[in-house]
Design a protein with these regions (language model features):
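Catalytic beta/alpha-barrel core
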Residues: 23, 37-39, 55-66, 75-88, ...
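Short, acidic/polar
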Residues: 3-13, 62-68, 176-180
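Glycine-rich, proline-tolerant flexible connector loops at the mouths of alpha/beta enzymes
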Residues: 23-42, 197-207
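Catalytic alpha/beta core domains of metabolic enzymes, predominantly
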Residues: 96-198
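Catalytic domains of carbohydrate-active enzymes, especially glycoside hydrolases
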Residues: 9-25
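A structural motif
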Residues: 19, 74-76, 125, 188
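Active-site-adjacent beta->alpha loops and helix N-cap segments on the catalytic face
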Residues: 4-5, 32-46, 65-66, 81-97, ...
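Alpha-helix-loop-beta-strand connector modules within alpha/beta enzyme cores
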Residues: 36-60, 92-99, 148-163, 208-231
Length: 235
C-alpha cells in the first residue's frame, strides 16, 4: 500500500475478481530498518477509503497498543507473526469487540499458536481468525514451509476460522498459486494473497505479489477446486 491511486486501483481489481476483504499494511514490521515501513496513519485512511469505495471491509496489521486510536475505522485487526506472543497486545485485543486475525509465529507450534489465540478469547473477544503463514525450518524450497497439515489439525481442534497466507510462505510469486491450491484442498476457510498493480515496482514484498490478472486466475483455479476440498470428513 503506497499511494491513494495504487490502493484504489488494486481494491477495485481484487473486488472484481471475487475478493471479500481488502488488506493493506500501514504499519509494516520489516526485518531491515532501512526498508519501507508503511504509510502509518495516512495509510490507514487511504485503506479505509479504498475499502469503502470498493465495498469491501478492510484489515490491517496492528503492531502496538498505541496504534488503536488510529485504527478505529478498520474492520479487522491483524496480529502479525512477529507479534503472535506479544501478550500485552493480545490482552488488549481481547478487550475489543472487533475481529482479530492472528498469524502463526515463525517458529511456533500449533499448541503455542492456539494458546496465543486463547489470550484474545479469554478476554471476551470471540471473533478470532487463525492464519497459517508457514514456519521457518531451513529446509523448505520456499521462504517458509507452509504447514498444510496444520489446517485440518486446527479445524479439528477449534471452531475458529482458519485462513492461509500462501504469499508470505512462498516468498516468490510463481509459488503462490500451488500453495494456495494446496491450502484450499486441505480445507482452509480463506486465503490472504498479496496483489500489486506493478509488482516489479513495489516498495515491499514485490517478489511474492501477484498482478491483478494473476489474482483473477488464482481465484478461478481455487473456485474450481473447492468442490473437492476437504471439509472435515474422516478417511
Amino acid at each position: 500500500m503506497e499511494s491513494a491511486p495504487q490502493i484504489a486501483a488494486v481494491a477495485q481489481s481484487v473486488k472484481n475478481a471475487g475478493a471479500q476483504v481488502l488488506r493493506g499494511g500501514a504499519f509494516k514490521p520489516r526485518t531491515s530498518p532501512y526498508t519501507f515501513q508503511g504509510l502509518g496513519g495516512v495509510g490507514v485512511e487511504l485503506l479505509v477509503q479504498a475499502g469503502r469505495d470498493a465495498g469491501l471491509p478492510v484489515i490491517t496489521e496492528i503492531t502496538d497498543v498505541s496504534q488503536l486510536p488510529l485504527l478505529e475505522d478498520v474492520d479487522i485487526l491483524q496480529v502479525g507473526a512477529r507479534n503472535m506472543q506479544n501478550y500485552s497486545l493480545l490482552k488488549a485485543l481481547g478487550e475489543l469487540r472487533r475481529p482479530v486475525m492472528l498469524k502463526r509465529g515463525l517458529s511456533a507450534t500449533v499448541e503455542e499458536f492456539l494458546l496465543a489465540a486463547e489470550y484474545i478469547l479469554s478476554g471476551g473477544n470471540e471473533q478470532v481468525i487463525l492464519c497459517e503463514r508457514g514456519v521457518q525450518s531451513g529446509l523448505s524450497a520456499a521462504r517458509s514451509a507452509l504447514d498444510v497439515a496444520a489446517i485440518p489439525v486446527l479445524k479439528k481442534a477449534t471452531h475458529l476460522p482458519v485462513l492461509v497466507d500462501p504469499s508470505h510462505a512462498a516468498g516468490r510469486s510463481e509459488l503462490v498459486l500451488p500453495l494456495a491450491l494446496a491450502a484450499a484442498a486441505a480445507g482452509a476457510d480463506g486465503l490472504m494473497v498479496e496483489v500489486h498493480d506493478r509488482p516489479a515496482c513495489a516498495l515491499s514484498d514485490g517478489g511474492q505479489a501477484l498482478t491483478c490478472r494473476q489474482f483473477q486466475e488464482l481465484t478461478e483455479a481455487v473456485n474450481a477446486l473447492l468442490p473437492y476440498a476437504w471439509r472435515g470428513e474422516s478417511l
